[in-house]
């Protein structure tokens, strides 16, 4: 007979278990803890934990343990329960309740079933249990089947325990104390499980909302949508490499699961402010592009100039000018127009740094030709805005457009600061908002220096740069070779743009190789 001290000890175990369950974040480990705790406080040899399926038609095997047979499935066992055992139907083919199966009966009625000997029990079908015993040599005797009801009194699963063990007499019945303790644990476990599932559902909803923002950016511009997806992957690759570092200045850096989740969320949101950036600036593939590429307008103007020149040629001939001479002037003009058009088309691409002589030639073209616009006005061939764009030194963006692009990080910070972050995500804004800062304080928007920034913000900064260098879906360039990207990243380190210690881990742990294998084209991987 159980002593009062034994009962108090088991009650203390129950209290300790309740606290432990509330702290477990991993769903499979939580389920395992529930079953192992139930086995411990009832001294059961075996047990199974079922969860109700989403359609409420089946019980799904989640965790199974039988100590004397050394059977372990699900949880941390390394043996998945999925597919090992068939789901237990709650209803028969005719739609009637499957009350002959004890676990199904408990799930349908919410009643605990305490059976002293399955072989002697009436009203339940234990043929499957007998077959299991015949195959394994086991003897399933006492059964305790308990519903798991959450805080809304909704059944979400079933806890089934087998063969209570007495140190003196072996297999015994589950006592009333066992039953009450198991029912109390099942109630606590169901609430902890519901809370964990609710948190997971909220996390899934939150991440889905983040992905919705990235999808909006993707719909605006396919050139940045891929960026929003790849930067988090590269960030986490680098973070795991840093976490594994055991020497140097990063030896003490560690990541918990909460830290990983917080960093991933920050990386997913690092460019959310781009929803405010005009699409024609984000997608500006050439210097003259706005909603369309204005180089086509310049082509048309050249054709107008050549047409006007042809008209002048025939008028000159009609006025008595020597025909070969008039034709020579016309043809020379057309050749000059064609040559200047080819030049402007090349300049418009913005692929190379603009030379001083090319800038002068562009300005000369702008002033040497005159044409009549649709209003009949005689105007310079190129407008001031077109000259400004065509003489951009490098790339395709003017200073104003670059400022517009850079403003996205300000928008990102404002958007993230407006959210009521829970404690475990309180650093998201700092992580996401710092990826354009530099180690020397010359970055933006806050001109932070290395010591002002977290390691995580610096990780996102490296991931952001390396992804942009190697991206194959940008409008203004093809995907860069891996060796060239690494050389440029080295220059960024030497110029105090990125963190040198993180850069060292990036190289030594060959993070770039894992990223290249997952995201780069084979022709880009040249080292």
What are these model-predicted stretches?
Residues 1-6, 126, 134, 139, ...:
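Regulatory loop-to-helix N-cap segments in sensory/regulatory domains
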Residues 1-33, 39-41, 60-63, 198-212, ...:
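Signal-transmission linkers at sensory-effector interfaces
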Residues 1-4, 108-112, 158-159, 167, ...:
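Signal-transmission/dimerization alpha-helices at domain junctions
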Residues 15, 23-75, 97-102, 224-225, ...:
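Helix-loop-beta substructure at the N-terminus of cytosolic sensory domains
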Residues 48-97, 120-121, 268, 288, ...:
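GAF sensory/regulatory domain recognition
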Residues 70-139, 373, 391-392, 398-399, ...:
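Regulatory sensory and allosteric helical modules in signal-transduction proteins
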Residues 141-152, 157:
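A short, aliphatic-rich beta-strand micro-motif
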Residues 173-177, 213, 283-311, 386-416, ...:
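Divalent-cation-assisted or electrostatically stabilized phosphate/pyrophosphate-binding catalytic cores
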């Amino acid at each position: 007979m159980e002593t009062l001290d034994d009962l108090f000890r088991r009650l203390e175990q129950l209290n300790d278990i309740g606290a432990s369950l509330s702290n477990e974040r991993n769903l499979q480990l939580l389920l395992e803890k529930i079953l192992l705790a139930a086995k411990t406080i009832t001294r059961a040899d075996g047990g199974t934990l079922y969860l109700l399926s989403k359609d409420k038609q089946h019980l799904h095997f989640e965790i199974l343990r039988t100590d004397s047979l050394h059977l372990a499935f699900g949880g941390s066992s390394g043996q998945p329960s999925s597919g090992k055992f068939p789901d237990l139907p709650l209803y028969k083919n005719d739609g009637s309740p499957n009350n002959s199966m004890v676990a199904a009966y408990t799930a349908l009625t919410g009643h605990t079933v305490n059976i002293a000997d399955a072989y002697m029990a009436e009203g339940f079908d234990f043929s499957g249990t007998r077959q299991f015993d015949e195959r394994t040599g086991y003897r399933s005797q006492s059964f305790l089947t308990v519903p798991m009801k959450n805080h809304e009194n909704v059944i979400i699963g079933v806890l089934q325990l087998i063969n209570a063990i007495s140190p003196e007499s072996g297999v015994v019945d589950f006592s009333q104390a066992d039953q009450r303790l198991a029912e109390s644990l099942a109630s606590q476990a169901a609430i902890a499980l519901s809370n964990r599932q609710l948190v997971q559902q909220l996390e899934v909803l939150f991440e889905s909302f983040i992905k919705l923002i990235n999808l909006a950016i993707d719909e605006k511009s396919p050139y940045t949508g891929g960026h929003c997806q790849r930067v988090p992957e590269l960030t986490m690759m680098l973070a795991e490499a840093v976490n594994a570092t055991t020497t140097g200045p990063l030896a003490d850096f560690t990541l918990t699961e909460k830290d990983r989740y917080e960093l991933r969320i920050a990386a997913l949101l690092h460019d959310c402010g781009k929803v405010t950036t005009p699409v024609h600036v984000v997608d500006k593939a050439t210097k003259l592009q706005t909603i369309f590429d204005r180089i086509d307008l310049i082509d048309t103007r050249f054709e107008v100039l050549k047409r006007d020149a042809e008209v002048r040629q025939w008028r000159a001939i009609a006025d008595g000018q020597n025909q070969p001479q008039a034709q020579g002037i016309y043809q020379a003009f057309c050749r000059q127009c064609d040559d200047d058009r080819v030049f402007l088309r090349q300049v418009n691409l913005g692929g190379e740094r603009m030379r001083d002589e090319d800038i002068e030639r562009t300005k000369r073209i702008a002033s040497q030709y005159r044409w009549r616009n649709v209003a009949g006005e005689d105007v310079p061939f190129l407008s001031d805005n077109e000259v400004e764009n065509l003489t951009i030194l490098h790339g395709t963006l003017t200073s104003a457009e670059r400022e517009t692009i850079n403003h996205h990080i300000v928008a990102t910070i404002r958007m993230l600061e407006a959210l009521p972050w829970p404690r475990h995500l309180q650093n998201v804004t700092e992580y996401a908002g710092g990826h354009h800062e530099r180690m020397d304080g010359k970055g933006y928007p806050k001109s932070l220096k290395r010591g002002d920034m977290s390691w995580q913000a610096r990780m996102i900064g490296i991931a952001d740069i390396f992804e942009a260098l190697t991206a194959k879906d940008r409008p203004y360039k093809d995907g860069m070779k891996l060796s060239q990207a690494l050389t440029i990243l080295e220059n960024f380190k030497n110029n105090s743009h990125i963190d040198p210690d993180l850069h060292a881990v990036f190289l030594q742990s060959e993070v770039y190789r894992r990223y290249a294998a997952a995201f780069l084209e084979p022709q880009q991987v040249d080292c």
